Amino acid sequence: MCFLVSCSGNIPFSEDEKGALKKAKTEIAEMKKNPTMAEKERILQKGLEVQKKYLRIGVVYFKSVEKDIPMADYYLARNYSARGENEEALKWARKGSNRGVKEASAFAGHIYANQRDEMNARKYYIKAMDQGDYREDTLFRVWVYGERKEINSEVVEAFKRNLNKNIEVKNALAFYYQRHDYFDEAEKLYKELVNEKYPNAERLLGELYMSKKDYDKAEEWLLKESENLFSHSEDNVKRIEEKRARLLRLLAKVYEMKGDYGKAENNLLKAKELAHKELALTSLAKLYEKQGKYNQALKINDELEELKKTKKRKIKS
């Protein structure tokens, strides 16, 4: 345990840190007189609190209870990482991972990813998922570090192991299949998501059909999503408007590919009034150019330039 010198090289503790260290030693000694799990949990929480001000002192608290509380390994890993001691951080992250701490597994994956060690990054992100970490970021990184020209069987098997444990896994696997043009497998999973009332599942299925260039089915499913999206409201107005604008832009693309430029234009005009106006305007200008309507395209490009200038002025102010 580190006392009069810091845990980071040979930099001595400041007077304030020495005071915090003395208090930590006293509190830990008291805990050892009555070493119940409740007392050890209290020491762990105290370490989290103290490290906000005295980062290096947090280690003292965490190490005093880590044998009995595996989560302390994760906190030690985060603490060392925050001080730039990545090898020490990795040591504790791996230890926590081996003790079943999903947060530690994901953090080990994060460290390996930063070291550009993709194989180990994938290994630990998969381990985190197997331990029950179904956060969007973790699932995303499982398939990102499984990205190659060919689909990665290790990643597929990992997703399949967890397929019925969390619905987000099914969505992640469907997307992974779609990225590698395994359209039939992706379609099956997206249809299951539709039946399970997964949010935006109709849109996801519509986008899959766009990838397959089956624009009739894409239109069918995007319109089903439209019925849901435009028939209810959300407390977060900005969020619902962004969802609606995105759907309208997708429908516009489908209609453009089907040669129905009128419907494509109408959807883009609606989309630009909701959210991300610049995206709708950019698509609208291209649509007009495609039809040889160059004067209208120029007007839209002028509107787009003015929008960019307005945004720059807002940023400066």
Show which residues each predicted segment covers.
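N-terminal leader/linker segments that initiate helical-solenoid repeat arrays
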Residues: 4-75, 82, 312, 316-317
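Register position in tetratricopeptide repeats
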Residues: 82, 114, 144-148, 179, ...
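Start-of-helix register in tetratricopeptide repeats
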Residues: 71, 103-105, 135-137, 168, ...
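Single-residue signature of alpha-solenoid repeat helices
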Residues: 57-58, 89, 121, 155, ...
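Residue-level recognition of tetratricopeptide repeat
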Residues: 25, 78, 110, 143-144, ...
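Short helix-capping/linker turns of helical repeat alpha-solenoids
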Residues: 68-69, 99-101, 132-134, 165-166, ...
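Canonical tetratricopeptide repeat
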Residues: 75, 107, 138-141, 172, ...
